[in-house]
Amino acid sequence: MATKAAFAKMNGLGNQIIVADMRGRADRITPEAAIRLAGDSETAFDQIMAIHDPRTAGTDNYIAIINCDGTEAQACGNGTRCVVQALAAETGRQAFTFETRAGILTATEHEDGLISVDMGKPRFDWQDIPLAEEFRDTRMIELQVGPIDAPVLHSPSVASMGNPHAIFWVDRDVWSYELEKFGPLLEHHPIFPERANISIAHVTSPETIDLRTWERGAGLTRACGSAACAAAVSAVRTRRTGRTVTVNVPGGPLRIEWRDDDHVMMTGPAEWEFSGTFDPATGEWSRDAQNDKPTDRGAA
């Protein structure tokens, strides 16, 4: 019988994260285990960030990302910040390089506790997002919610931050739209062969965007880092904002900078909640009796 793995329950602006220590192990977290953990009120999560041994020279770890429905994700900016906080507390280091399904990510913890993640370069070609049919201009595509002559939402910007995003621009409060109603329908729309993250965005100034997101494989979320990045770069492409903005998500603000080298930097906090151990095959878990913070004795 395999030994249990250590984990830390954390969050990035309310985006619920489990950071699981799978280093030195040959097994993987099963979809069944993920679904069981997601169904428990104490361990309910949006994503599991499973830290594995590195696969590629020059990286510190491979990070497998698992949604609460048991599917795998390519990217999770909020989860990456949680991983950095956990590993920084364990190792005393501030800078890390990770490999994910989306590619190589670098991240740094600052003296003020905020964490910056280089989310890489956005992609806008319809085949890279991907879309099921050709669109030469992905700043706006033909897609709408509601009646043809009076759509509730229409003409989203689409982009990939290693995962597909659709951003619907609106001119009033993002909370006035029933994202919980149409989010799952749009996530599974045929135009998105790999499904998509669906966001509503309201530009409130040249430096600020309000954003709500229906996250692919997770549902409504208080924060989605890659969606904030996708909204920021799409706002620049549609001439709504400058290249550095604050994206206000339900959980709080994220600072997004689309640099001149085309890389997107995301900066925000991470928060530790509790630690424990779990069975990667079944999802059976227990809370650590001591339950110290990672700054006291290391994390996941």
Swiss-Prot record:
Coiled coil: none annotated. Pathway: Amino-acid biosynthesis; L-lysine biosynthesis via DAP pathway; DL-2,6-diaminopimelate from LL-2,6-diaminopimelate: step 1/1. It holds the Pfam family DAP_epimerase. Substrate binds at N15, Q47, N67, G77, N78, N163, N197, E215, R216, G225, S226. Residues 285-300 have a biased composition (Basic and acidic residues). It catalyses: (2S,6S)-2,6-diaminopimelate = meso-2,6-diaminopimelate. GO terms for molecular function: diaminopimelate epimerase activity. Residues 275-300 are annotated as: Disordered. The record marks H165, E215 as: Could be important to modulate the pK values of the two catalytic cysteine residues. Keywords: Amino-acid biosynthesis, Cytoplasm, Isomerase, Lysine biosynthesis. It is found in: Cytoplasm. Catalyzes the stereoinversion of LL-2,6-diaminopimelate (L,L-DAP) to meso-diaminopimelate (meso-DAP), a precursor of L-lysine and an essential component of the bacterial peptidoglycan. This is Diaminopimelate epimerase. The gene is dapF.
